[in-house]
């Protein structure tokens, strides 16, 4: 799976 965050 792929997970990313921004902020």
Swiss-Prot record:
Swiss-Prot/TrEMBL keywords: Cytolysis, Secreted
Tissue expr: Expressed by the venom gland.
Presence of the UniProt keyword Secreted in the record: yes
Signal peptide per UniProt: none
Superkingdom of origin: Eukaryota
One GO cellular component term: extracellular region
Membrane spanning residue stretches: none
Record-level GO BP terms: killing of cells of another organism
Localization: Secreted
Role summary: Presents moderate hemolytic activity at physiological concentrations (micromolar range). Does not induce mast cell degranulation, lactate dehydrogenase (LDH) release from mast cells and antimicrobial effects. In vivo, injection into mice induces increase in nociceptive sensibility, but causes very reduced or no edema formation. It also causes no alteration in rearing (standing on hind limbs), but does not impact locomotion.
Protein name according to UniProt: Cryptide Pep-10
